[in-house]
């Protein structure tokens, strides 16, 4: 394969992996530990 193809595939794979990890952190099991500042502020 050409160098440009390998670079494009590796950058795309990294971007997809980062997006998957961000979604898992936001909505998956670790999201239970995130604090909600709107619930802490009682009006």
From Swiss-Prot:
Q: Which Pfam families match?
A: PsbN (PF02468)
Q: Where in the cell is it found?
A: Plastid, Chloroplast thylakoid membrane
Stretches that traverse the bilayer: 5-27
What is the membrane topology listed in the Swiss-Prot or TrEMBL record?
Single-pass membrane protein
Identify one Gene Ontology CC term for this UniProt entry.
Answer: chloroplast thylakoid membrane
User: Which Gene Ontology BP terms does the record give?
Assistant: photosynthesis
Kindly state which keywords UniProt assigns to this record, in alphabetical order: Chloroplast, Membrane, Plastid, Thylakoid, Transmembrane, Transmembrane helix
**What is this protein for, i.e. what is its function?**
May play a role in photosystem I and II biogenesis.
- Give the family from UniProt: Belongs to the PsbN family.
What this protein is called in its record is Protein PsbN
Q: Which organism is it from?
A: Amborella trichopoda
